[in-house]
Amino acid sequence: MEMLDIFLVSFLSKNMKKMIKLSQISRFKTINRVVYGYYPFQDNRAVVIPFPMAEHLEEFIKRRKEAKNEYFQLNVSGNEMDFRLPDKGKYRLYDFPEASFDKSDQESVLKSIHYYLLDFFGDSVDYQLSTNYYAHLIPKLPHLSVCVTFNLSVLHDMKSFEDFLSSTPVLKRIQMHVCGTKKRLSPESKLYQAEYIRTIQHDPHFPAVLRHFQGRQAFLSFAKCEDLELIEFVKRWKSGEAFQKLEYMKIKMTDNKPPRYEVLNAVGVKYTDKTKQPPTHTLAKVFITGDCKPYTDPIISHSYVVRESDNRVASVSIHRNELNFGVWNKTEDEFLKLMD
């Protein structure tokens, strides 16, 4: 059965819901995220819940008025709510019936659905609210994180934007486009605390993700990035001064190519035995994007650096206009043994 059918059957009774939870244990173990909102990627590990945020609500309400007879009622977490079967999308079906609600009920509807699913899948699943709108309050719900997409260049009120970021419960992903702006964010901005960040920006200083990032994975695209900034990034990781949680960093430059050996020598890289195949660094992405790849691009490099504070190793690769940096959960001795 499709997930949509399983959910519909689960509303028949409490006993039916219990039976589904028991009979689908193996299937539910493969699910690692529940996404509220737009998620057009082919990802079998995700359950996608149709939930329009404020930027799409007017269109959503209009569609609801035009299709009155298609709606039916379900009891969700003790609340009677109107639903309809979701339209067949171009890429995939949604996995849950589409709720009907007014703008004023948005928070209570999300709360009811979230608690229903939390009881269904448990707290080991990652619950993500996906939105590209920053001027409304995100409800604080247990185990709910937020994924935000925006264009920093068109934001006029930076204080409101910072207030929105600080009011969000947990920032899972930030995806942003920055062009032709000198708007600065505070070094303490919650933007830099997102677990996953993907940026396209002209200048690496606006915002200064390369300097202030505190999350796990970053994919940064700059028009130009000076060699000294790449060197400073690696040295600050080596010293333990910054990037303590970092797992993976990809830095791509469109207008310049860093001199490979000069940068590697400047950061004090070490080299594995050139006669042996170096270990391959790759790990599961925090968030799957349009390329639909569940894992980071492999780093196969003889060059590596060691963090002074805990002897942790990171593979470093510079190829053409890219720097790739992958942190291993291994000490230097453990890392070198991988080649044996």
Segments the model singles out, each with a brief description of its role:
Residues M1-D340:
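Non-core capping and flanking segments associated with repeat-based/extracellular domains
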